[in-house]
């Protein structure tokens, strides 16, 4: 429907590799690896083991007459020093997208995990079979778990998980294409210590 709220709208960059194949006329697949952050702690002479962030994902685009559907999934390993070497504030976009509110650099550094985990899954669909009507769907769920830390003497979950869904309906005219866009996402509850219930984003272009 629009830019991806998890990986951004094309402005993100990083080392990676993509392998794609077309199995049939209608079904293909792409396997990818992304190193979103690397060598963010230590020096050239001191090798750190918790300062990189890696993701592996799979998309399976399927195209039929008037219908396109792409389910996808992605998993990741997140070193707790991969956020600018553990020296960041919440103006850092990746921290804004992946950490809960109050998830500062000190909170992350004191977590009981050297490496956290992340996983995402979703589906996008486009229906043009009923042209000039067009319908599109985009939905995703994601979770990031960097363990448990301490805040004000209490356990603080350095976790974030949530979902969003968007639906688009359009009608194509000769001069323009009016449409309606509906979207909804999960949100935080009243407990700031049990993690965030918002969708995590690696490089957010649209915050949800």
Show the residue positions of the predicted features.
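Signature for the C-terminal beta-barrel architecture of outer-membrane proteins
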Residues: 3-195
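Flexible glycine-rich, low-complexity coil/linker segments exposed to the extracellular/periplasmic environment
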Residues: 193-208
